Amino acid sequence: MARQHKSILFLFINGPHHVYHLVIPALRFAALNNKIETIFISGNPVNTQIINDTKAITGINNFTLVDIPLPLRYRLKNYKNRLYPPVYTRIKKIIKYLENANAIISTSHNFPDYLSRYKIKAPTLFYLYHGTGTREYGFETSLEKFDHILIPGKYHRDRLKESLSLKDDQIEMIGKPKLDYLKIKLSKNKKLFNNENPIFYYNPHWEIELSSYLKWKEIILQFFIKNKNYNLIFSPHPLVGHLSTKRGYEINEKDIAEDNILVDMGSNQCLDGTYTSIADIYIGDISSMVTEWVLQKPRPCIFINAHNVNWKNNENYYMWKFGKVVNELKEFKEAVTESISFNQYNEIQKILKSEFIFTADKSS
């Protein structure tokens, strides 16, 4: 039986780090579409604020915004250090919208499983990459459950076709929509430090087994405390703090008071492109944030091999071709000195940029 009500759903029910990848495609669809109701569903107040801020900038408002209320415990300050509820707790609140949708666009790998749990089978499902990472996670078999996958560029297309059972017409290269967000949102004149010294941006990943955060955070902080001629933005992925209680580690760097060190464990600036646009040298491990860094403009990168990984022929560490990989403090100090002088990886960054990101007049 034909569905009487037609709607297209854009789901913003993951963390805020997903929103910046989806909000511009969602708004552009809403602007072009006048036949089918466009619905944005937000899973927490931070997501809602990002959507509303971007709506105000673009002037696009012909969509319905559904804001799922937070459970009471999440309205309490510092509830288990959690920033927002898990995705699966949001699904039950929006069943009627899911059942009435013709198509759903999600950034969550597990979303088809949630639909199956509630026996919702009809909508056409789109998955949009929330980043440009190269780890196995981005190519797992759960993606085969989507009807269409919206990807950044050639690298992901080729690897998906090699790894999964997908047809050509299921994969669409759209570029990196977050870059479109950065173009309209970023302030070019923002100043974070009261000096003109080089700014390093340390951005460890949230997955502790792979991240440099626990093993290297004190090393990094002490180095910059002793070297006042450098500035440091110390800003891990927000999930580092979000998962700290669950994973049993402490966040003890919040109270550092040094003129040359900015510690940010979870503000919007961690994710909205502020730091990647202002800093001069990137320090990281396995985060795909480095591709955002290179795509804004090629600059030096330092990667910390905190777990002594044999990375050179490992596709999960493909992005380490962007810069210098260090295993110990001595190598780190050398890499810092070298990075101030010039970007010796400039040419390969430009080549890899073309492999990773499909470009057209409008990427999303």
Regions found by a protein language model. Name each.
Residues 246-291, 296:
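Donor nucleotide-activated moiety binding/catalytic core segment of transferases
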Residues 21-33, 179-252, 324-326, 357-363:
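Conserved catalytic-core segment of nucleotide-activated headgroup transferases in glycan assembly
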